Design a protein with these regions (language model features):
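Transmembrane-helix bundle of Major Facilitator Superfamily
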Residues: 1-140
């Protein structure tokens, strides 16, 4: 059985989720003001904690797959991201939410380059690789 379509779909879904979380939190801001009593300053940190940690670590995290194995690195990234996501859903205050968003950013920084690295190693034929990267790029 050819597992490549399943692998590509999984990697595209991972990349989509990572990028969705950059903007998705903006929809929840009015609710955060009501439920957590968040100030404008705290709202800005809630939005930026994810993006800052993601941007700061994505280049360094890109080499983790080469060092420790791509599959293992992706799983670790997904676990970190998932733990941050679950903890964020249960955050009792804005400080906790900022911290969990930062944890999610760390996981995202691991996931994002690892998905592309896996694609380039699974799809070795030039045309096939170009299509796979194109689909991955479209999902982000």
């Amino acid at each position: 059985m050819n597992r490549r379509p399943v692998i590509l779909a999984t990697l595209c879904l991972c990349a989509f989720a990572v990028n969705l979380d950059v903007t998705l939190v903006n929809v929840t801001l009015p609710t955060l003001v009501v439920d957590l009593g968040a100030t404008t300053r705290e709202l800005q940190w809630i939005v930026d904690a994810y993006t800052l940690t993601f941007a700061a670590l994505v280049l360094a995290a890109g080499s983790l797959g080469d060092r420790f194995g791509r599959r293992r690195t992706l799983i670790v990234g997904l676990c970190v991201y998932g733990i941050g996501n679950a903890a964020g859903a249960l955050a009792p205050d804005t400080t906790s939410l900022v911290a969990t968003r930062a944890v999610m950013g760390i996981g995202a920084a691991i996931i994002f380059p690892t998905t592309l690295s896996i694609i380039t190693n699974v799809f070795t034929e030039r045309g096939e690789r170009a299509r796979a990267i194109g689909l991955w790029g479209a999902s982000t």
